Structures are given as C-alpha cells and as structure tokens.
Regions:
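N-terminal leader/targeting pre-sequences
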Residues: 2-188
Length: 188
C-alpha cells in the first residue's frame, strides 16, 4: 500500500479547491491529488529538532501544481503536553534563509524571519502555513497554496515552533521558540 492510498476515502471535502489566476479557474480533484502525491516532489526539507528536542524528525515535500504548491508534511517526536485538553498545536512556517544554525539565545536563528517577498503583514506572509496538530507526538498534513511555487522556496528553510501561531501578533504570530528546522532542497 502506498503511503497516500488512504487519501482517496478522506478527501471529499477537498474535491474542489478554486484558484483564480490569469482569468482561469483551477479545480483540484481527488485524481489530481493522488497523481501529485504519488510523484516525486520538486523539493524537500528534512527536519530535525534542536538540542532540547533531539527526537524531533520529519520532512516537508513540495509538489508543483498549476498556480502554486501542494505541501505534504510528516513529523514525529513533537513535544507533548499531557492531559486530555492539551492543544499540542505547533506553528510551521517557511523562513527566509536556508540555514539551520543557531546561537546560545535562539535555535535556528540563522533561518531569519518568515519568507515574505511582498512585505505583507502576518498572517499574509508567503511563508505562513497551516499549523500542525500533533497526535501523541506525530503530525501529518497536506494542503495547497498559491503563495509560492516549490522553486521560489528552494534554498529557504521550514521552521517548526514550540507553540501555535495566533495569526494576529506581529510580526510572526507569537509562535514561540524554534524547535525544528530543515533546509528546502530541490530534488528534480
């Protein structure tokens, strides 16, 4: 069984994603999604945790699709707050620089700020992505965006933050410490 075969039963709500560019409409259907995620991605970030989160690992794949990108992310080893009401939600952003080094004050500080080529306020940065919902330390998500193509983000980094993004606080959503990082590299 391919890793994305299970999507066919759970994708009804994504039967149609509409994107208007250049006067035309784009309809993304189940068959299109299956052909996208079954192909080799154009780019991938292999993620690792910082010194406080050495078990954090994962990847984010970037697939070109029409006027944007399908992103598939899978992570494991995310920190967990105990209790039945803990949110365990983590912000995930593309940052401007493809450098996962840091300093004593901040892990992965060399990644810079959010990728924001049009100088938009948060949460309209091109690098703002949906949050990760962790389930006992594991998270998987897939989404479509027209904010960037895979080629526009190659050489940049994906950062996982310790908290959820509040989608309000400027300049970056009060998402907390940087706990994971991976440089986006081209694969084709």
């Amino acid at each position: 069984m391919r890793r994305f075969d299970f999507l066919s039963d759970n994708i009804g709500y994504m039967r149609r994603i509409v994107c208007k560019k250049g006067g035309g409409f784009l309809y993304l259907h189940e068959q299109s999604i299956m052909s996208i995620v079954g192909a080799r991605p154009a780019a991938r970030a292999v993620l690792r945790g910082d010194e406080k989160h050495p078990g954090l690992r994962g990847y984010a794949d970037f697939f070109p699709y029409r006027c944007g990108t399908v992103v598939i992310a899978e992570l494991w080893g995310l920190p967990q707050d105990p209790g039945p009401c803990a949110s365990n939600i983590f912000a995930m952003h593309i940052h401007a620089t493809g450098d996962c080094t840091g300093d004593m004050d901040m892990s992965f500080s060399s990644a810079g700020g959010h990728y924001n080529p049009k100088n938009c306020p948060h949460p309209a940065h091109a690098g703002d992505m949906p949050p990760l919902f962790s389930n006992r330390g594991y998270a998987w998500q897939g989404f479509y965006t027209d904010r960037f193509t895979p080629w526009e983000v190659m050489g940049r980094s994906v950062i996982i933050h310790a908290k959820r993004d509040d989608f309000t606080t400027q300049p970056s959503g009060d998402a907390g410490d940087r706990i994971g990082c991976g440089v986006i590299l081209g694969l084709r």
